[in-house]
Amino acid sequence: MDIGKKHVIPKSQYRRKRREFFHNEDREENLNQHQDKQNIDNTTSKKADKQIHKDSIDKHERFKNSLSSHLEQRNRDVNENKAEESKSNQDSKSAYNRDHYLTDDVSKKQNSLDSVDQDTEKSKYYEQNSEATLSTKSTDKVESTEMRKLSSDKNKVGHEEQHVLSKPSEHDKETRIDSESSRTDSDSSMQTEKIKKDSSDGNKSSNLKSEVISDKSNTVPKLSESDDEVNNQKPLTLPEEQKLKRQQSQNEQTKTYTYGDSEQNDKSNHENDLSHHTPSISDDKDNVMRENHIVDDNPDNDINTLSLSKIDDDRKLDEKIHVEDKHKQNADSSETVGYQSQSTASHRSTEKRNISINDHDKLNGQKTNTKTSANNNQKKATSKLNKGRATNNNYSDILKKFWMMYWPKLVILMGIIILIVILNAIFNNVNKNDRMNDNNDADAQKYTTTMKNANNTVKSVVTVENETSKDSSLPKDKASQDEVGSGVVYKKSGDTLYIVTNAHVVGDKENQKITFSNNKSVVGKVLGKDKWSDLAVVKATSSDSSVKEIAIGDSNNLVLGEPILVVGNPLGVDFKGTVTEGIISGLNRNVPIDFDKDNKYDMLMKAFQIDASVNPGNSGGAVVNREGKLIGVVAAKISMPNVENMSFAIPVNEVQKIVKDLETKGKIDYPDVGVKMKNIASLNSFERQAVKLPGKVKNGVVVDQVDNNGLADQSGLKKGDVITELDGKLLEDDLRFRQIIFSHKDDLKSITAKIYRDGKEKEINIKLK
């Protein structure tokens, strides 16, 4: 690649150097832009960036000028190095020829002297090296701070120059040259001081050692001279300087000299082993420059890089001390080896240095990759977080816009919803209250009707007491029997009251004391009574308007479980007007009644069963339904141990038939067939055989006596006939026979009977009139 001024280089090398040059300038520009962003508006910084990128032509021109000057200087340096190498080769050959014939005694003496002074030299050398290390570290810190200050100044100046699109100033180049020259001067001074101190220590040990060290020190000024020449050269950028040194080391590796001697080869091998552990001064310089370059490239990692460089410096100093001690012990052998061993050692030390440089570069690359990956992960996490926040912000913005656009409608809608909920709750409460009121009203109505019926019934129920007995010949205890009971006013005609009660209440007394609910009393007269139905009618007169006629119901329509009220006067006047409540527990009951108290039942009373409380004094009281109408008259209760609330009432329809005859006739005319009979159940076996009764007959009656010219005699009944059916109904006993006959008291029709006579079954008609 022809770059002008009669210089030709490979194209790949040209591109590499151009990239390095542009990289350095871009890095400086980026630093300047980073500082400008803190002080200048975004608009100004963007304009400056555009102007910088437009100045690509000027960059190429500056690069070509810099590269051409660098190549000229390199050619001069190469020529000078060749001259110096030829001169040094001649000197080394003469020194080798002069020292080749030294005896082994010199080496033995040198080894003994070295063993004596080994400990003292180590301590002194360690102190000297530690002081030199501290001085180098301090100078490095000062130089780094100076470089940072200079870079900041450059950034400011570069920012000013970016607006005018000018080239970098000469002041920056001079400061760079001064910093690099000061660094190289400090390194060369440290090397000369170390060599002088080593030479002074060698003079104290022995004269022979002083001669060897003096010969060795003669070579040191050459190094310093070369360093001075390098310092006088025009400074290059850091990457270029590093590459130049690598090329020089490679040139040194190609220089080999053959001096045929097995002993010399063994000594050179020993020296080479030591040289593997000996870091060179140029290695230190390269490391320092590399560290400075890394610090400049990445200002954010200055602290970490400096700490790593300090650790490497300490490790290298320790290795130097150890290797220098061994080097002093084998100084004679190393000098007798000659230039061949020196060149081989330098070759191996150069390889070691290159390996250490490569390892250091790999370590820095790994650290850089690790940091880069960590930064990338952090950037990804930050970007995800920012995206999430942006999404949330977008949602919030959308909601805000929606609210700003439609908030009046939303407020109205919410108000309507709240109003609907409130109205619904109000209507539900109103309906609930209405239902509760309806239920309460229904309950109140029901309760009021019940109470009304009870109060009306109480006005129609009276207390009945017999005053005197008509038959004065009866014993007092018998005359006082059933003295108090209850009665019901079933009809009122003006001031005349017709009261129905039980026959066993009035007894055989004609006059009865009637007491009303208002405690007024009158005397009533018994119009008629019937012991077979246990009913009686009393007539009384009263102008008291509070006494009411009771309403009459229909007992043919009774329902099992129908609620009823019982009103009467239990235990006399003191508890008059007592009301008890119950239900109809049974219908069509046949209740046996003992009227004359001879412990023998006289009649089957047709009644319905109630469970309301009935006590002595309730006989003749009223049983009303839920409408307050009379459906029955209390007649009896079962008074037996362990029996409760089993009472019976005569149906009102039967009562009406009886009281009608009692009002007009004063008695009830029942048909009398003129027979006496026994129950089959009471017959013994002899009596059953006498009447030739079949074994299958279990119930019925046996005619025991027939009146002459009576209805039974006229009908053809004979003594010994067994009657099992009457009027199409099974006949259980004589009470049932009387009940069936009395049930036809009104029509007096003939009824059919099934009988057994002489063991044969037959039917006959019994006349009732």
From Swiss-Prot:
<feature type="compositionally biased region" description="Polar residues">
    <location>
        <begin position="126"/>
        <end position="137"/>
    </location>
</feature>
<dbReference type="Pfam" id="PF13365">
    <property type="entry name" value="Trypsin_2"/>
</dbReference>
<keyword id="KW-0472">Membrane</keyword>
<feature type="compositionally biased region" description="Basic and acidic residues">
    <location>
        <begin position="264"/>
        <end position="287"/>
    </location>
</feature>
<feature type="active site" description="Charge relay system">
    <location>
        <position position="619"/>
    </location>
</feature>
<feature type="compositionally biased region" description="Basic residues">
    <location>
        <begin position="1"/>
        <end position="20"/>
    </location>
</feature>
<keyword id="KW-1003">Cell membrane</keyword>
<dbReference type="InterPro" id="IPR001940">
    <property type="entry name" value="Peptidase_S1C"/>
</dbReference>
<feature type="compositionally biased region" description="Polar residues">
    <location>
        <begin position="365"/>
        <end position="390"/>
    </location>
</feature>
<feature type="compositionally biased region" description="Basic and acidic residues">
    <location>
        <begin position="71"/>
        <end position="108"/>
    </location>
</feature>
<dbReference type="InterPro" id="IPR009003">
    <property type="entry name" value="Peptidase_S1_PA"/>
</dbReference>
<feature type="active site" description="Charge relay system">
    <location>
        <position position="504"/>
    </location>
</feature>
<feature type="active site" description="Charge relay system">
    <location>
        <position position="534"/>
    </location>
</feature>
<dbReference type="GO" id="GO:0004252">
    <property type="term" value="F:serine-type endopeptidase activity"/>
</dbReference>
<feature type="transmembrane region" description="Helical">
    <location>
        <begin position="410"/>
        <end position="430"/>
    </location>
</feature>
<dbReference type="InterPro" id="IPR036034">
    <property type="entry name" value="PDZ_sf"/>
</dbReference>
<feature type="compositionally biased region" description="Basic and acidic residues">
    <location>
        <begin position="21"/>
        <end position="64"/>
    </location>
</feature>
<dbReference type="InterPro" id="IPR051201">
    <property type="entry name" value="Chloro_Bact_Ser_Proteases"/>
</dbReference>
<dbReference type="InterPro" id="IPR043504">
    <property type="entry name" value="Peptidase_S1_PA_chymotrypsin"/>
</dbReference>
<keyword id="KW-0812">Transmembrane</keyword>
<feature type="compositionally biased region" description="Basic and acidic residues">
    <location>
        <begin position="138"/>
        <end position="186"/>
    </location>
</feature>
<keyword id="KW-0645">Protease</keyword>
<dbReference type="GO" id="GO:0006508">
    <property type="term" value="P:proteolysis"/>
</dbReference>
<comment type="similarity">
    <text>Belongs to the peptidase S1C family.</text>
</comment>
<feature type="region of interest" description="Disordered">
    <location>
        <begin position="324"/>
        <end position="390"/>
    </location>
</feature>
<feature type="compositionally biased region" description="Basic and acidic residues">
    <location>
        <begin position="348"/>
        <end position="364"/>
    </location>
</feature>
<protein>
    <recommendedName>
        <fullName>Serine protease HtrA-like</fullName>
        <ecNumber>3.4.21.-</ecNumber>
    </recommendedName>
</protein>
<dbReference type="Pfam" id="PF13180">
    <property type="entry name" value="PDZ_2"/>
</dbReference>
<dbReference type="GO" id="GO:0005886">
    <property type="term" value="C:plasma membrane"/>
</dbReference>
<feature type="compositionally biased region" description="Polar residues">
    <location>
        <begin position="247"/>
        <end position="262"/>
    </location>
</feature>
<keyword id="KW-0720">Serine protease</keyword>
<feature type="domain" description="PDZ">
    <location>
        <begin position="680"/>
        <end position="733"/>
    </location>
</feature>
<keyword id="KW-0378">Hydrolase</keyword>
<feature type="region of interest" description="Disordered">
    <location>
        <begin position="1"/>
        <end position="287"/>
    </location>
</feature>
<feature type="compositionally biased region" description="Polar residues">
    <location>
        <begin position="331"/>
        <end position="347"/>
    </location>
</feature>
<dbReference type="InterPro" id="IPR001478">
    <property type="entry name" value="PDZ"/>
</dbReference>
<keyword id="KW-1133">Transmembrane helix</keyword>
